[in-house]
Amino acid sequence: GLFEGYELKLNSYDLGVDIELNDIVQRMRFEHPEVKVVVMQSGKDKVFSAGANIRMLGAASHSHKVNFCKFTNETRNAYEAAEADSGQKYIAAIKGACAGGGYELALACNYIMLTDDSSSAVGLPEVPLLAVLPGTGGLTRITDKRKMRRDLADIFCSIEEGVKGKRAKDWRLVDEVIANSKFDQTVQERALEFAAASDKAGVSQGIELGPLERQITDDGIVYEHINVTLDRSYRRAEITLKGPSTPAPADMAQLQAQGDQAYLLKLCRELEDAILHLRFNEMDLGLWVFKSQGDGAAFL
């Protein structure tokens, strides 16, 4: 884990896992635009994901938990929107227990497949087990996205053991239930079908995302296109966006040739990194001030 007091088990996750997942989603979008279908599955037997690590949540401060849930939601939203934004459809292939944040992770996928065996079930047990509501979109997605009846949603959220097999399909919790003996083959077939039906344009070459260069000091962070100045006495962070120093690319070929050094791409990556740093390492800074500098004509 990121701090003492917990150990990641049963495919549970913490902020570190979600940072890796967010990085993967962005790399699928930019480095592998030829990919049309992404299958999300577990590398462990008998468990898909147990969700957010309970001991981590118990040991974390309130502000850490709030920012953790926000970042987790943003990551879920990113791959949920990937089909519309970048033509990549995400499939959740569930074998084993899929509970709490683990099921919320699957709910953000565009298609959910569940194997039909004695150990595979989906559930949101936060209310009966922890007396809290699901924190990363579970209730919203089962009713608004999957169109589950609200009375069934109430029952579902009160069941500790979750819902299996045909009932999960009947309650609209999953899109497809497959016999365990045919599950892996069916997942492969469905992925190929979705890829064949995709109207995403064929792209053979992506943009490799290299590591960001930054310098962290006691009173700020310096990137190529962003400066972050920390004023802890006033609990304020000043984020300065610097304009481009070279003309914009004339066409897509020039933009692709610039790779991860293209101004807008690098600026957005640096800004995302700076915001993540401020959220979790400078939580006492309650005011962020955004400024810009540079030649306005260079943006046009």
Positions of PLM-derived features:
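Short acidic/His/Gly/Ser-rich catalytic and metal-binding motifs that mark active-site loops
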Residues: 1-2, 47-51, 123, 132, ...
